[in-house]
Amino acid sequence: VVPEYGGMATPQAKNLFLLCGDGELAHKPGLIVSISSGNGGSYPIAELRSSSYKNTHLMWIPENIIIRNVEDYLPGSHGDLIPEWMDNRVDYCLKLLIAYSENMQSLIKLINRKDFGNGM
């Protein structure tokens, strides 16, 4: 979960991915959830997709969640600014993340970070 900070991902979120360069997140599925106090929230997703996977080898799943007007969001009961389908979207994405995780278990046996930890 990354809050929008001046139209971008927070420096702390970016720093976390810089610190995880020793395989902690390698070949594990991830779901980006962006939250915004206004109508934004898309830029942190684009930023994390473009810059956080290179050295971490984290595998972002194709889906993402943007919760806009986050102050009004409470699962199951939320204000007028939150779409009714938001809870279903969150459930769908979490189920998909679990499915990716379960299906990637067989790939873990093939990973050779010792010889090929940095790509090419």
Regions found by a protein language model. Name each.
Residues 60-120:
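Glycine-rich phosphate/pyrophosphate-binding loop and the adjoining helix
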Residues 1-56:
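Helix-loop-strand module that forms the ligand-binding subsite of alpha/beta enzymes
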